[in-house]
Amino acid sequence: MKVILQQDVKNLGKKGDIVDIAEGYGRNYVLPRGLAIEATPANLKNLERLKANEAKKKEQELMDAKELGAKLSGITVKVRSKAGEGGRLFGAVTNKEIAETVEKQFGLKVDKRKYELKQPIKTLGHYPITVKIHPAVSAELKVEVVSE
């Protein structure tokens, strides 16, 4: 019996795979639990359509990420913070502050978790920061921390 898996099944396959299983296993376990559907011509056609839509969606996400990466690359973000003697900040500049400043200054909304900041910035100066927008796309921007 050929079935199309609706979700990942251990020792059988991943979602969307077409697998050949025993009649009893399919009728008594896999189909009643909703783990798979029968591989009829209509269901196979539907599966192909879903895979094509998913591929288009992933391609669009990649294009959007590349576009955002191009906009972010090379920009300099000015973050104002209170500083004491020797250029040490009262507090620190974090991913959240950088994300808010980029959105305010340039209108580009990027999740704060995408900014790769090894540790918070605690002194005045220029800092290069990598933004991991998509697994395949990253951009480098500069953060300039200035005193208020």
Swiss-Prot record:
Keyword Ribonucleoprotein: yes
A Gene Ontology cellular-component term: ribosome
BP term (GO), one: translation
Coiled coil spans: none
Entry-linked InterPro entries: Ribosomal_bL9 (IPR000244), Ribosomal_bL9/RNase_H1_N (IPR009027), Ribosomal_bL9_bac/chp (IPR020594), Ribosomal_bL9_C (IPR020069), Ribosomal_bL9_C_sf (IPR036791), Ribosomal_bL9_N (IPR020070), Ribosomal_bL9_N_sf (IPR036935)
A single GO molecular function term of this UniProt record: rRNA binding
Keyword field: Ribonucleoprotein, Ribosomal protein, RNA-binding, rRNA-binding
Origin superkingdom: Bacteria
Job of this protein: Binds to the 23S rRNA.
HAMAP family: Ribosomal_bL9 (MF_00503)
Protein family according to the UniProt entry: Belongs to the bacterial ribosomal protein bL9 family.
PANTHER family, alphabetized: 50S RIBOSOMAL PROTEIN L9 (PTHR21368)
Protein name, as recorded: Large ribosomal subunit protein bL9
